């Protein structure tokens, strides 16, 4: 019989919310008897935007804005049906993007 694995990938702009969500997922999975690997911090994606400060000219005067996307990876090995039900009922903050692969 092949091992089942659920891979959960979390993304957020704020690392505090991301870590809280990862802790909730890990705690829920451990409470229902599944084996956990993670949360593994993945590289932070950094997007840089450069814009002119003035509306028309003065190209030498520019302002830079950055957007950081923090990521975490959690693997749940051999999940039980209780684990899947508990994860479906879990309430996470709206600022966290969740990607689940079976």
UniProtKB/Swiss-Prot annotation:
Part of the 30S ribosomal subunit. InterPro entries: Ribosomal_uS10 (IPR001848), Ribosomal_uS10_CS (IPR018268), Ribosomal_uS10_dom (IPR027486), Ribosomal_uS10_dom_sf (IPR036838). Keywords: Ribonucleoprotein, Ribosomal protein. Gene3D superfamilies: Ribosomal protein S10 domain. This is Small ribosomal subunit protein uS10. The gene is rpsJ. One of its GO terms (biological process) is translation. GO terms for molecular function: structural constituent of ribosome; tRNA binding. SMART domains: Ribosomal_S10 (SM01403). Pfam families: Ribosomal_S10. The keyword Ribosomal protein applies.
